[in-house]
A protein has these predicted regions:
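Secreted/periplasmic carbohydrate-active enzymes, especially glycoside hydrolases
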Residues: 1-181, 206-207
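Active-site-adjacent "subsite" loops/lids of carbohydrate-active enzymes
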Residues: 124, 186-207
Length: 207
């Protein structure tokens, strides 16, 4: 989900969905439904659309939910919403996924620099490799939470994930704790130093 337009009065949440039909014999007609809830579990908007997916094929669909008076995500107030996506055959749910999102507006201005929800923000951060001493790359979530809290208490508001793919748990913590993330996958991007290296995953991760 993304929020290209977001103010304290109203926000547009755009949701991109790809649905796969693994049946090899016939097309499948389904309904895609998205429901957005605030942090108290109150529904703030929904959208649904019918579509037909070819046998052994996939279909992409984009939906929009308009939220009035949204609680915007910021460094000081990292408000989050829960987005529930359902794939339905008739009234029966055949698949679903839950996504946590923040509603915010990001802008880069040639004179003012980085703007978050219309306010100028100076990024004060660190490079952070995905490792933690004796535990290596298998970093427990509580350890990440402790380290991020120490950084935030020291005035840090941003993290660059230097040369490593961050875990979803790490990114979720940053969302929850109000920390900006410069999500660098790895220093090779599409141009690998070796034939079989990180760069082979670049397209998949960027998507």
């Amino acid at each position: 989900a993304r929020t290209p337009d977001a103010t304290v009065q109203q926000a547009k949440v755009l949701i991109d969905i790809t649905v796969l039909n693994e049946a090899t014999s016939s097309p499948k007609g389904v309904t895609i439904k998205n429901v957005l809830y605030d942090d108290k579990g109150v529904e703030t908007g929904s959208s649904e659309s019918p579509l037909t997916i070819d046998a052994n094929g996939e279909t992409k669909v984009m939906q929009q939910i308009v939220v009035d008076n949204p609680a915007l995500w910021s460094i000081e107030s990292p408000n989050l919403y829960t987005l529930k996506t359902y794939v339905m055959s008739g009234k029966r749910v055949i698949d679903n996924v839950t996504t946590t999102i923040g509603i915010r507006h990001i802008e880069y201005d040639i004179n003012k620099g980085f703007l978050l929800n219309g306010k100028q923000v100076k990024m004060k951060g660190v490079n952070l490799h995905h490792e933690a001493g004796g535990v290596g790359a298998a970093v427990p979530e509580r350890m990440w939470e402790r380290r991020l809290q120490i950084l935030k208490d020291g005035g840090c508001n941003a993290v660059r994930t230097a040369h490593n793919i961050p875990t979803t748990e790490f990114l979720d913590l940053c969302d929850k704790m109000g920390i900006l993330v410069i999500d660098e996958v790895f220093d090779e991007w599409k141009s690998g130093k070796r034939t079989y290296s990180y760069h082979v995953f670049c397209e998949e991760w960027c998507e």
